[in-house]
């Protein structure tokens, strides 16, 4: 017999399958020995009141073993003789495009400018240890994309529930914990995601596809208005329709398209800082108790949003129990991001705190700077990103040390003469962010912080530190494509894909878009 139950239970009752069996026994009157397996279908924490509960949907197998897997397996066929399709970029958009191509009988040829996920880790370590940024192998470029070493967060606002479930199932098939199928905010963790990515690559190769690292697309091969392949830095050309999944930091790709008058447009972004608190403080605030999360609750998260001066101010990519990391993709820039290991066990909580930026804001943002491009250029907000990242580098001492300021000092426009301990390993340098960042951003952040401090008592504190700058929240450019065919609006055979093309925001939505682009190629 199988029973499904929707329950509201205490955190200590939700910690293990054995404790859940006790709950099922209590609710059904069936003795624990007869309850063979309990699966968690959905799980979320309700911390709105002083007594905290866990909402769970359970499937209990009574007097029988499950005869169904916890997740649906996708069957991948041999495509050695299939039509080749070039996939540029091995982030979630590109990798899931490749897997879907295999399902559809097409042969993916994946080219990635960076290194494989293990080799890439060494270059990322050098950023913190020696302040050296490899322009082709860093937090943005390399197998797995920007998400591989910056959290592995799978939460999405996508309404395409079937598509989301498919992506999560595929992650489980390649080694992710099945907990991502149940959790309200699923998270693989930076420590676990690399192995999952390797497993996906091995599957692509097993099926007859190809994966080429340290192979950068330098040009599209265009014949009679149709993209038929790519030229690369290795001198080798790869032929076939092209899925362009290069990520939001591939600025050379945007410049290449713009220089050749291939239609793109400016897209809104958000910029700001990484805000870091002691995790214990966030636990106390969010769980409404002095002892924090105790033994049975996870590191607490938060989410804030406000409207200030006609623009959104909000938290972004919140990382409980995480670390702030250097995310520059070339020299002369400092960019920060956040990550969490699977256990979310560090002493710090961090989140992007960002202000919405629209293309029409460019002139105001750059009023004290020399404009690198015209205000009407599709590259305008990219130019703003670049200038702000360079300013951050200059104010951080022209290395990967990040300029930083205590939170209350920033709100009061005061210099911070010392800084709290931080997870950011290249180091912090006290700096007046309120002075050198654009007032368009800092003024809205100040008002946003005051509002967040009112709705969440204790959040606005000098125990928190702001670390500059957070600029890579999304692509500053959209590569225009047809809504039905997923092809570029003027170039047949080119399928702009994922976050870098301006059609996704995060791992899951990029993966969904990769699958849709693969289906577009199949219908081409």
Where are these regions (language model features)?
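Residues forming the flavin
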Residues: 1-54, 58-149, 153-524
């Amino acid at each position: 017999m199988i029973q499904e139950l929707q329950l509201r239970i205490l955190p200590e009752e939700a910690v293990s399958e054995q404790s859940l069996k006790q709950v099922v026994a209590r609710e059904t009157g069936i003795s624990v020995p007869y309850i063979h397996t309990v699966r968690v279908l959905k799980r979320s924490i309700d911390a709105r009141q002083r007594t905290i509960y866990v909402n769970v949907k359970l499937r209990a197998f009574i007097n029988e073993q499950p005869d169904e897997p916890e997740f649906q397996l996708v069957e991948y066929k041999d495509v050695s003789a299939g039509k080749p399709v070039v996939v540029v970029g091995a982030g979630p958009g590109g990798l899931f495009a490749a897997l879907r191509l295999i399902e559809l009988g097409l042969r993916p040829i994946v080219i990635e400018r960076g290194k494989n996920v293990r080799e890439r880790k060494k270059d990322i370590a050098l950023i913190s240890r020696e302040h050296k940024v490899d322009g082709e192998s860093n937090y943005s470029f390399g197998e797995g994309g920007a998400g591989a070493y910056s959290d592995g967060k799978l939460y999405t606002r996508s309404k395409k529930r079937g598509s989301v479930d498919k992506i999560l199932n595929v992650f489980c098939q390649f080694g992710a914990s099945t907990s991502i199928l149940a959790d309200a905010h699923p998270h693989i963790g930076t420590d676990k995601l690399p192995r999952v990515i390797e497993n996906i690559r091995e599957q692509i190769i097993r099926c007859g596809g190809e994966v080429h690292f340290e192979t950068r697309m330098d040009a599209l091969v265009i014949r009679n208005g149709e993209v038929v392949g790519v030229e690369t830095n290795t001198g080798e050309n790869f032929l076939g329709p092209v899925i362009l999944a290069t990520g939001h930091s591939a600025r050379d790709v945007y410049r290449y398209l713009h220089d050749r008058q291939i239609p793109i447009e400016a897209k809104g972004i958000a910029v700001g800082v990484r805000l870091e608190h002691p995790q214990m403080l966030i636990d106390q605030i969010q769980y409404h108790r002095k002892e924090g999360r105790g033994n049975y609750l996870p590191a607490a998260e938060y989410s804030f949003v406000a409207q200030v001066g006609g623009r959104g101010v909000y938290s972004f990519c919140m990382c409980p129990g995480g670390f702030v990391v250097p995310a520059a993709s070339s020299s002369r820039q400092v960019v920060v991001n956040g990550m969490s290991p699977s256990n979310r066990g560090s002493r710090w909580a961090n989140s992007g705190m960002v202000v919405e930026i629209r293309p029409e804001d460019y002139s105001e943002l750059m009023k004290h700077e020399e404009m690198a491009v015209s205000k009407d250029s599709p590259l305008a907000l990219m130019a703003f990103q670049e200038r702000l990242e360079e300013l951050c580098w200059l104010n951080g001492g022209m290395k990967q040390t990040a300029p930083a300021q205590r939170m209350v000092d920033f709100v009061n426009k005061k210099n911070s003469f010392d800084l709290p301990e931080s997870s950011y390993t290249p180091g912090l340098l006290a700096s007046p962010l309120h002075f050198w960042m654009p007032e368009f951003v800092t003024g809205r952040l100040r008002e946003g912080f005051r509002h967040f401090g009112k709705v969440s008592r204790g959040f606005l504190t000098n125990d928190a530190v702001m670390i500059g700058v957070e600029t890579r929240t999304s692509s500053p450019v959209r590569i225009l494509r047809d809504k039905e065919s997923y092809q570029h609006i003027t170039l047949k055979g080119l399928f702009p894909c994922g976050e870098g093309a301006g059609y996704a925001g995060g791992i899951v939505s990029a993966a969904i878009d990769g699958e849709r682009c693969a289906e577009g190629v199949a219908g081409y």
